[in-house]
């Protein structure tokens, strides 16, 4: 929804598709997403629907769904998209078994489309409130990266372009492991020295693995690498860090909030 607001404020026609009629009805009734973005008013000009036909004739479609469902959603909406639409991934993770990044999954389903990524140190809660934020728009197709940049940029959302989407996504996926460990450090009250060491060695390991997986080393020193790692290891918006804190404190899985049990 935060990206939808950003694009709408730049003069674009925006429709948000969701599989849940209950969520769509609640947003239309309340004028905000009280679960994900409480207090952030959504402009009335943004459409919300459960009908995927809304994607027909779109210039750009952004996937903002849990990584587990990226492939199934990409397959589900395929009848409504042609080869001219730019497909953008905004989810973080790797596909189970294949270890493909989310943009690679999308590209495998849409081999003829330009596919890009928008990623970096950005919590939706802050983007939606207009907190100054900087992220990366990445694509092997530089023109597509520029189009993503122009669609969402604002005076509070600065977007840099990059031609290494794989490296950008690997940084965004693997930092969650380090953030969980950082939370455990906090839960154990290990101190700043320990956490700094963990984060520093963590980005080193992410870089080494990321290069082996096809990313460029310099990518991991930027917003989608060290930047995303810092915000995820230090923010209470981060579910991985919060889960790590509970583990470090010895809280049993059954007593953790439902979203932090796994």
Predicted regions located by residue number:
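Cofactor-binding loop segments of dinucleotide-utilizing enzymes, especially the Rossmann-like FAD-
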Residues: 19, 92, 140
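N-terminal loops that bind phosphate or other acidic moieties
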Residues: 62, 194, 260-261
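Internal alpha-helical scaffold of NAD(P)-dependent oxidoreductase catalytic cores
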Residues: 69, 80, 105-113, 132-219
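Alpha-helix C-terminal capping/helix-to-coil transition sites in glycosyltransferase folds
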Residues: 56-57, 174, 226
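NAD(P)+-binding Rossmann beta1-loop-alpha1 motif at the extreme N-terminus of oxidoreductases
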Residues: 1-40, 49-50, 76
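Generic structural signal for residues in well-ordered beta-strands
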Residues: 14, 46-48, 115, 159, ...
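Rossmann-like NAD(P)(H) cofactor-binding subdomain of soluble oxidoreductases
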Residues: 42, 48, 53-132, 148-150
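NAD(P)-dependent Rossmann-like dehydrogenase/reductase catalytic/cofactor-binding core
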Residues: 182-186, 211-221, 225-262
């Amino acid at each position: 929804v935060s990206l939808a607001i950003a694009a709408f404020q730049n003069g674009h026609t925006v429709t948000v598709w969701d599989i849940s009629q209950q969520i769509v009805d609640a947003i239309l009734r309340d004028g905000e997403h009280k679960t994900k973005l409480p207090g952030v008013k959504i402009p009335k000009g943004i459409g919300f629907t459960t009908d995927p036909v809304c994607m027909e004739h779109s210039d750009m479609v952004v996937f903002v769904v849990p990584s587990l469902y990226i492939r199934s959603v990409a397959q589900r909406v395929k009848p409504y998209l042609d080869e001219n639409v730019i497909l953008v991934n905004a989810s973080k993770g790797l596909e189970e078994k294949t270890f493909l990044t989310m943009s690679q999954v999308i590209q495998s389903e849409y081999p003829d489309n330009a596919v890009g990524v928008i990623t970096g140190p950005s919590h939706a809660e802050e983007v939606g409130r207009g907190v100054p934020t900087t992220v990366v728009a990445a694509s092997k197709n530089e023109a597509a990266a520029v189009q993503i940049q122009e669609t969402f940029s604002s005076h509070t959302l600065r977007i840099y372009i990059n031609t290494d989407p794989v490296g950008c996504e690997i940084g965004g996926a693997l930092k969650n492991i380090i953030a969980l460990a950082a939370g455990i450090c906090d839960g154990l009250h290990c101190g700043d020295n320990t956490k700094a060491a963990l984060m520093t060695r963590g980005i080193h390991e992410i870089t080494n693995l990321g290069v082996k997986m096809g990313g460029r080393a310099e990518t991991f020193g930027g917003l989608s690498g060290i930047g995303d790692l810092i915000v995820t290891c230090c923010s209470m918006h981060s579910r991985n860090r919060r889960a790590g804190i509970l583990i470090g404190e010895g809280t049993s899985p059954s007593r953790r909030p439902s979203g932090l049990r796994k």
